[in-house]
Amino acid sequence: MSTQLQTWDFLPISMNLQGRECLVVGDTEQAVRKTDLLLRAGAKVRLLGDPHAKALKESADALNAITVIPDPFHPDLLQLCAVVVAASDSAMLNQQVAQAAQARGIPVNVVEQPELSSFIFPSIIDRHPVLVSVTSSGGAPVLTRLLRNRLESLIPHGFGRLADLAMEFRDKVRSRFGHINQRRRFWESVLEGVVSDLVFCGRTDKARAMLDDMLSGEQADAIKDTGEVYLVGAGPGDPDLLTFRALRLMRQADVVLYDRLVSPQILDLVRRDAKRINVGKARSNHTLPQQEINAMLVELAKEGKRVLRLKGGDPFIFGRGGEEIDQLADAGVPFQVVPGITAASGCAAYSGIPLTHRDHSQSVRFVTGHLKSDTCDLPWHEFVQDNQTLVFYMGLVGLPIISRELIAHGMKPSTPIALVSRGTLPDQQVLVGELGNIAKKVEEQQIPGPTIIIIGDVVTLRDRLRWMD
């Protein structure tokens, strides 16, 4: 038994308005917004309203691009119009405009009154020439806006560049592949593979060269067999701090190599069927040596896999990311790097401790606190500076040595210090003390890792700026 399909209130279509006359009635903010959309579509816009109205005066760009008519509305103004928009603050005038336009068969939109409209403006995700329209048929504009915001985070901003590249190669692909199924398979491999990732990260020239090689056949087999490595910074722990690009690559990877510092909440966002490999990196207990990790990245990519190398924080700040991509470059494996919010920045922000402040600190220094054999050749004398913030990564175990050396080189024992444990996560802890007593406090309270240590006068600002507590 067949089920009758529900009819639509509006048909979503795209209209060519290049060089065509359009009339907007009203001088409100809504009229200005609709005018901007029509101008983006290449229309010639006449606006009926007061040229001195506040909304128009605040939109100088729109005023310079349109003709403002300070006359009362008359149906004769509709001559030669492709579309009409009624956006005045008079319900009676808007209804009059709608009736006159519909009597002449001219598409009309009455703002916030879909029942009087023959067309409505959708919410738009702009990746020109790719445009995605979202509409609730005028019934739930807030819901439409929420849906658009979600889609904005899922569609890379480079989609427009990818569409331009596809159009550029359309004729070449048609000449190379005679059957539509061959062309479809080719474009699917291109748009879901390395070429699209190159475009998304701004390397369009490289993508163009790769497309030429694929079509010529000279390197088609090598391109097909070689995957790519994504070196992605996962940030300090809170999944909401991931970048859009990081999230997209996490969702398309075939295999992920992750460190101990990557939170379970972030791992949950990785593609469900991706193979997961824990490469560890706890203090003195590396699940895999760095050289084996480097070799594994190369091997997996050469198997044609999309390999996600997921690191806590930022891969280029005490993350050994440079070593890993150096070997990838030697092996000729394509890769891209996605920065993450480094632990110093994320933990400081979530603790209410600005790393720099005009009254307290004009510089900040990141230092590794991962000491080997209880010794360190750090330039301690350089750390003892006025108006400077020190941030030690991986310094929990070495905290007694760090405190002792800084005091020995001239830093006051009363210098404010904060230790942030599991920063940006729901169970974040912040322990504040002085350089001379912090090690004892940590021992008494059994603070768990991972931690960030912040030293300097900026720590005193936490009492007023602690927004997470």
UniProtKB/Swiss-Prot annotation:
Sequence similarity: In the N-terminal section; belongs to the precorrin-2 dehydrogenase / sirohydrochlorin ferrochelatase family.
Pathway: Cofactor biosynthesis; adenosylcobalamin biosynthesis; precorrin-2 from uroporphyrinogen III: step 1/1; Cofactor biosynthesis; adenosylcobalamin biosynthesis; sirohydrochlorin from precorrin-2: step 1/1; Porphyrin-containing compound metabolism; siroheme biosynthesis; precorrin-2 from uroporphyrinogen III: step 1/1; Porphyrin-containing compound metabolism; siroheme biosynthesis; siroheme from sirohydrochlorin: step 1/1
NCBIfam families the UniProt entry points to: cobA_cysG_Cterm, cysG_Nterm, PRK06136.1, PRK10637.1
Function of the protein: Then it catalyzes the NAD-dependent ring dehydrogenation of precorrin-2 to yield sirohydrochlorin. Finally, it catalyzes the ferrochelation of sirohydrochlorin to yield siroheme.
GO annotation (BP), single: methylation
Keyword Transferase found: yes
SUPFAM superfamilies membership: NAD(P)-binding Rossmann-fold domains (SSF51735), Siroheme synthase middle domains-like (SSF75615), Tetrapyrrole methylase (SSF53790)
Residue numbers annotated as active site: 259, 281
Domain of life: Bacteria
Catalytic activity of the protein: uroporphyrinogen III + 2 S-adenosyl-L-methionine = precorrin-2 + 2 S-adenosyl-L-homocysteine + H(+); precorrin-2 + NAD(+) = sirohydrochlorin + NADH + 2 H(+); siroheme + 2 H(+) = sirohydrochlorin + Fe(2+)
Cited InterPro entries: 4pyrrol_Mease, 4pyrrol_Methylase_sf, 4pyrrole_Mease_sub1, 4pyrrole_Mease_sub2, CobA/CysG_C, NAD(P)-bd_dom_sf, Siro_Cobalamin_biosynth, Sirohaem_synt_dimer_dom_sf
Annotated keywords: Cobalamin biosynthesis, Lyase, Methyltransferase, Multifunctional enzyme, NAD, Oxidoreductase, Phosphoprotein, Porphyrin biosynthesis, S-adenosyl-L-methionine, Transferase
PROSITE patterns hit by this protein: SUMT_2 (PS00840)
Pfam families registered for this protein in UniProt: CysG_dimeriser, NAD_binding_7, TP_methylase
EC number(s) given by UniProt: 2.1.1.107, 1.3.1.76, 4.99.1.4
HAMAP family hit by this protein: Siroheme_synth (MF_01646)
Positions of the UniProt region annotated as Precorrin-2 dehydrogenase /sirohydrochlorin ferrochelatase: 1-211
Modified residues annotated as Phosphoserine in this record: 136
GO molecular function, one term: uroporphyrin-III C-methyltransferase activity
Binding site for S-adenosyl-L-methionine: 236, 312-314, 317, 342-343, 394, 423
Organism field: Hahella chejuensis (strain KCTC 2396)
Annotated NAD(+) binding sites: 29-30, 50-51
Name by which UniProt lists this protein: Siroheme synthase
Region (Uroporphyrinogen-III C-methyltransferase): 227-469
